[in-house]
Amino acid sequence: TTLDRLNKGIKINQVEPELKIIKSAGGRLEPHVTCMVGYPWESLADAQNTVNFTKNLFKKGLISSLQATIVIPYPGTKLFAQAKKNHWLKTLDWNKYDMRQPILKSPIPDKKLMQLTRNIYLSCFTPQFIFKKLLSIRSLADIKFLFRSVRKFVGQLLDFS
């Protein structure tokens, strides 16, 4: 899997049990997950599994927030060296390394990668999530934070449309 190829030190089947442990700790812990799509070895089915997996974690209430991006191989990383060696880089224009567009060659068309990233964000925007966030309001600062979050969320959706 991608987690293995990137040496993340965790298997996909460990993610949900670990999140359950975090949630059982109580308090105000709010797990955040980052999901990336667009690896050169990733099939459309793999990427769709990432979307579905994330959506399932949200449905179960195991994550509170997420970041979805198209993978970017930054200079100095193993992925960048591997991408350079295997001719996976589409560009070396650093202005384009902002996670808003595919930089790596992928078997998945660019438009589809953008749509998948957008779908990851949309997977969290459920009635339960909105209701939970509204119930969490305790102060004016919470309301301001939620408005800023909604603005950022809409901005992310627009980035990937």
Predicted features, each with a name:
Residues 122-161:
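Membrane-proximal basic amphipathic "stem/tether" segments
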